[in-house]
C-alpha cells in the first residue's frame, strides 16, 4: 500500500517500510469496522447460515446450503488458498478421513476464498503438478469473504481465510472452533477424536477428560464423579 493511501501519521514510517497497521491504514480500519457488524460463530450458539457455490466430488458445481446438513455433524474446514503448500496436504488427508467421518454421521466441507473454477482446476490437476486430485468432499468458494467473516476465520490484512475449522453438531450448533498459524498443518486424528468426544458427551451426558479416546473412562459431571475419576487415575 503506497504512502498516498495512508494517514499523515503513517507517512514517515512508510518511507522506510510498508505499513499496514490498523491505526494507520484507513482501508483496513474501515473493513474491520464493517466486519464487526456481522454476528460471529460462538460455541454453543447456532452456526451462521450461508449458501455458496462449491466444486463437488461428482465434478460439478453446486450450491451448498449449510442448513441442509441439519441432522449431521459437520467439519467446516477453512484454509488459506488453493495451489499453496500446507493446504494440499490437509485436503488430501481430510479426503482420506472423510469416509471414517461419514460412518459416524459427519461430513467435511472445505472453504477458501478461491473461485469454484480455481477449486476445479486444483482438483483436476495431478499431484505431480501441485494438485490434490479428486477429493471426497466439496470445496466452497467464499469469494465474497462472508463465510470466513461470520465464522471468525478471515485474515483481514491478507484477505484470505485462516487455517482453522469449526465443528457443527447435528442440531446446527457450533461445538468446537480451532485455528492454526498458516505454517502449521492440522491433525486428522485430532479432528475425529473431537467429533467422537462431542457425540459421546451428547449421547451419554458424561464429560471427556484430557486426551480422551473412545473406550477410555469419562467423568460424571458431579463433585462425586470427578473425585471418583481422579482417585482412579
Curated annotation (Swiss-Prot):
Keyword Nucleotide-binding among UniProt keywords: no
Pfam families noted in UniProt: 1-cysPrx_C, AhpC-TSA
Catalytic activity: a hydroperoxide + [thioredoxin]-dithiol = an alcohol + [thioredoxin]-disulfide + H2O
GO BP annotations, alphabetical order: cell redox homeostasis; hydrogen peroxide catabolic process; response to oxidative stress
Domain Thioredoxin residue range list: 41-200
Subcellular compartments: Cell membrane
Record's subunit section: Homodimer; disulfide-linked, upon oxidation.
Protein name: Putative peroxiredoxin
Species, as recorded: Entamoeba histolytica (strain ATCC 30459 / HM-1:IMSS / ABRM)
Amino acid at each position: 500500500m503506497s504512502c498516498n493511501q495512508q494517514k499523515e501519521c503513517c507517512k514517515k514510517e512508510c518511507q522506510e517500510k510498508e505499513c499496514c497497521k490498523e491505526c494507520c491504514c484507513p482501508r483496513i480500519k474501515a473493513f474491520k469496522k464493517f466486519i464487526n457488524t456481522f454476528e460471529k460463530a460462538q460455541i454453543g450458539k447456532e452456526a451462521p447460515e450461508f449458501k455458496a457455490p462449491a466444486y463437488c466430488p461428482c465434478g460439478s458445481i453446486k450450491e451448498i446450503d449449510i442448513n441442509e446438513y441439519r441432522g449431521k455433524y459437520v467439519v467446516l474446514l477453512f484454509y488459506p488458498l488453493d495451489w499453496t503448500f500446507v493446504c494440499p496436504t490437509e485436503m488430501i488427508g481430510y479426503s482420506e478421513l472423510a469416509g471414517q467421518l461419514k460412518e459416524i454421521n459427519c461430513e467435511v466441507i472445505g472453504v477458501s476464498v478461491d473461485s469454484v473454477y480455481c477449486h476445479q482446476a486444483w482438483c483436476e490437476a495431478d499431484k505431480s503438478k501441485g494438485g490434490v486430485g479428486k477429493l471426497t468432499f466439496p470445496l466452497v468458494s467464499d469469494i465474497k469473504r462472508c463465510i470466513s467473516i461470520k465464522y471468525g476465520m478471515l485474515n483481514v490484512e491478507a484477505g484470505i481465510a485462516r487455517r482453522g475449522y469449526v465443528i457443527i453438531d447435528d442440531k446446527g450448533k457450533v461445538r468446537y472452533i480451532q485455528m492454526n498459524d498458516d505454517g502449521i498443518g492440522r491433525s486428522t486424528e485430532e479432528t475425529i477424536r473431537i467429533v467422537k468426544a462431542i457425540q459421546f458427551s451428547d449421547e451419554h451426558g458424561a464429560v471427556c477428560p484430557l486426551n480422551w479416546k473412545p473406550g477410555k473412562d469419562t467423568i460424571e459431571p458431579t463433585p462425586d464423579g470427578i473425585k471418583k475419576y481422579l482417585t482412579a487415575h
